[in-house]
Amino acid sequence: MRRSRLATLALSMAASIGVALSLGAAPAQASPSDRYVALGDSYASGVGADSYTSESGNCLRSTNAYPALYNANIRPASYRSVACSGATTADVINSQLSALSSTTTLVSVTIGGNDVGFANIMSTCVLQGESQCVAAVDAAMNVARTQMPGRLANVYNGIRNRAPSARVVVVGYPVFYQLGTVCVGLTATSRAKINEGINLLDDITRTAATSAGFTFADVRSIFVGHQLCSYGTKWLHALNVLNLTVSYHPTAAGQSGGYYPVFRSAAG
């Protein structure tokens, strides 16, 4: 999420607000000879997981992010992450696809949340009322339905054109809230609506990935019990007024316990 959009959250009181794979193509076996490139936004760069590399600057790439964990455990022949906090589908096309080549054999990408305005939605839902929150999510869902299939197709076509032989794994987003628990902060209606919006984006992304012949790695199931408002160990940051950038992003445990095993399975 973009830091500028989250900055308004500092006006709010800090409150606790509270795997399965869809296969377009069967994942091949991981190989030490793989040449792996990671694309995407803050969920791929590892915002919220700490241990950011100095070279990544404002992109905030973490050594605890799922692409870095894959590199550390599988040891592909080469690895490069160009995932960047705040990235949109346009940013992937304009600034990240150049990292791919005909020798790339594995690509991961998590993208779309900034296109539909994750950060703006959470700002609205925290700072305003239930009706404004629901309206913000409805507007984002309209963008998801009308704009995201085409935007995602453009990204996926760009990946295939630049890396024609690569296995491509499209990794989705976790649903933020566990429902039906006692939880302060947002209303139950707002939490359910936010979940509805995330589910829609994931479903649209899965369809687009499958149509492109890519593998969709769905992290929603594995995060159940670790969401905001759950009684288990949280794998997502709630609102953090001392470090707004990490709000609603996976923790290091969320990357290692949630994202990494799902991606590892999908990658082969």
PLM region descriptions:
Residues 69-77, 150-167, 200-217:
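A structural motif corresponding to the C-terminal end of an alpha-helix
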